[in-house]
Regions:
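Short gly/ser-rich loop at a beta-strand->alpha-helix junction or flexible surface loop bordering the NTP-binding
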Residues: 2-194
Length: 194
């Protein structure tokens, strides 16, 4: 009896359903039919993949000029979105050197990158001085572990990591890239340090 009921049910289904493509197993292959979607009916779903936004060329140029170091303000000001910045940091493509300061090439930061980082933390008028400037002027042979940065007297910064901030009321004009104290000032500072 069970066999008879199965046959009747199959006969009814065959009468009411249109002929569907069949798989090799004899099952309907309706799931394999691709129906083009109307683009106007697409909705956003969580987890949907979006094309990655690239880093703006101006930002890449600035990073190259600054030994692969950028501030958060520079990145956002030159067109990077907060979400792209977040992705670069979470995927460790960019690494933080300090709060709001990033190394952008995915490798360990070089001394030059750390020097630029200190200048950027120090602000618009900051410049390398003493042994750090002496190293860049090629009168101090080895890059110093502590990078000394000259800042205006009114700027208050705590020394941190490899950076020592030295305040002065008589800030000389900087030169070079990264900004550093002029050669005569650097020589005098090094003579006084010894």
């Amino acid at each position: 009896m069970a066999a008879a009921r199965g046959s009747i049910a199959e006969d009814r289904a065959a009468q009411t359903l249109p002929d569907l493509p069949q798989c090799a197993s004899g099952r309907s292959a309706i799931h394999s039919i691709a129906v083009p979607l109307d683009p106007s009916r697409r909705t956003h779903h969580a987890g949907e993949v979006h094309p990655r936004k690239s880093i703006p060329p101006e930002l890449r140029r600035l990073a190259a000029e600054q030994a692969d170091v950028l501030t958060r303000e520079q990145a956002l000001g030159l067109g990077l979105t907060r979400s792209v910045l977040h992705r670069l940091l979470t995927q460790e493509i960019w690494t933080p050197l300090a709060s709001g300061l990033y190394h952008t090439n995915g490798t360990r930061a070089s001394w030059q990158s750390l020097a630029w980082g200190g200048v950027l933390v120090g602000g618009d008028q900051a410049m390398l001085c003493r042994r750090a400037a002496g190293h860049l002027w090629a009168i101090h042979p080895d890059p110093p572990e502590t990078i000394q940065i000259l800042i205006p007297d009114e700027v208050r910064l705590q020394d941190r990591d490899c950076w020592q901030f030295i305040r002065t009321r008589n800030l000389p004009g900087s030169t070079g890239s990264p900004p550093r104290s002029p050669l005569p000032d650097t020589v005098l500072d090094l003579c006084l340090d010894d």
